[in-house]
């Protein structure tokens, strides 16, 4: 089972690497030490830039023509992604970076990320199931949020055709019971490590709230979505997937993703980059010069 943490008081200032912040977000799902180096990046991110606040993992929408705030989140245990709280600007900004094409540095960075992909959470078990099609569910919060984000009928059909469903580490006990009953031996428990399964599958299905599609892209897997076509809200990584899809660049998804790690204007900062502060400063300078902000 996932290891448990002691009781902690609520955080009054959420920040990457803060144990209380992560406890309130993930409960008893303990984050792996593989995430620890990210603090070397997040500690350099200012609380305010271009006259607006920067917050960890908090999402909202600004008016379409300007930025009222920024958010940042961690992904793949090696990356901090900074983006404006404005989906239209977020997508366009990433498209502009992708069109610049990948550099040698960007390609080297994604190669290192690929070589070191690992689970974000400490999980106890590995599975030797013969998984070809793997469905990766989001946490309980998105299974239940405003009617749910997943197309459960599509998942049922995929399971009938032989797909396995991997439960998210943050899955409530009652949902574990319901989903195990629904999909039987095709349902993989939340305590089972994801990446050994992802590395051997042929195709991965995911929601746009999940970073898993980026992992699958790096691993050269076929990908598919399980999002409901009509749902409220936007996924954490939805602007990234939309930019990769809509950029109009005729190249592999791998190289498009490498382009985001090539140019600091994208807001992607990885532990394998040489100068974190320079990338952060260039990003906010670019955003100030290119887009309107709240006055």
Regions found by a protein language model. Name each.
Residues 1-52, 141-143, 148, 282-295:
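N-terminal pre-catalytic "stem/leader" segment of glycosyltransferase-like enzymes
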Residues 6-14, 136, 153-190:
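Catalytic donor nucleotide-activated moiety binding site of glycosyltransferases and closely related
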Residues 9-14, 56-60, 132-142, 167-169, ...:
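Short loop/turn segments at strand-loop or loop-helix junctions that form parts
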Residues 15-20, 61-63, 143-145, 171-178, ...:
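Short, charged/polar "capping" segments at the starts of alpha-helices
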Residues 65-76:
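Phosphate/adenylate-binding glycine loop and adjacent helical scaffold
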Residues 78-125, 233-295:
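Leloir-type glycosyltransferase catalytic cores
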Residues 121-131, 184-187, 191, 229-231:
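Catalytic phosphate/metal-binding cores of nucleic-acid and nucleotide-processing enzymes, i.e., regions
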Residues 192-239:
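A donor-sugar binding/catalytic signature common to diverse glycosyltransferases
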């Amino acid at each position: 089972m996932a290891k448990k943490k002691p009781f902690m008081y609520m955080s009054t200032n959420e920040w990457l690497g803060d144990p209380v912040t992560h406890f309130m977000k993930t409960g008893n799902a303990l984050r792996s030490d593989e995430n620890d180096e990210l603090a070397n990046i997040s500690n350099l991110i200012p609380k305010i830039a271009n006259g607006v606040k920067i917050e960890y993992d908090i999402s909202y929408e600004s008016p379409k023509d300007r930025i009222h705030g920024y958010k940042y989140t961690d992904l793949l245990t090696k990356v901090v992604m900074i983006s404006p709280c404005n989906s239209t600007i977020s997508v366009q900004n990433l498209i502009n970076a992708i069109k610049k094409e990948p550099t040698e540095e960007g390609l080297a960075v994604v190669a290192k990320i690929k070589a070191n992909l690992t689970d974000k959470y400490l999980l106890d078990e590995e599975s030797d199931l013969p998984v070809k099609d793997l469905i990766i569910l989001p946490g309980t919060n998105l299974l239940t949020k405003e009617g749910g984000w997943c197309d459960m009928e599509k998942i049922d059909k995929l399971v009938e055709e032989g797909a396995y469903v991997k439960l998210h580490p943050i899955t409530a006990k009652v949902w574990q019971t319901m989903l195990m009953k629904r999909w039987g031996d095709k349902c993989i428990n939340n305590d089972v490590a994801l990446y050994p399964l992802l590395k051997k599958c042929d195709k991965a299905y995911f929601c746009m709230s999940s970073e898993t599609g980026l992992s699958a892209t790096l691993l050269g897997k076929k990908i598919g979505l399980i999002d409901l076509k009509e749902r409220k809200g936007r996924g954490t990584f939805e602007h990234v997937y939309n930019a990769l899809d809509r950029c109009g660049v005729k190249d592999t998804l791998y190289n498009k993703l490498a382009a985001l790690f090539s140019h600091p204007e994208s807001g992607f900062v990885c532990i394998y980059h040489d100068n974190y502060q320079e990338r952060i400063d260039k990003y906010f300078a670019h955003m100030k010069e290119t887009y309107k902000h709240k006055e």
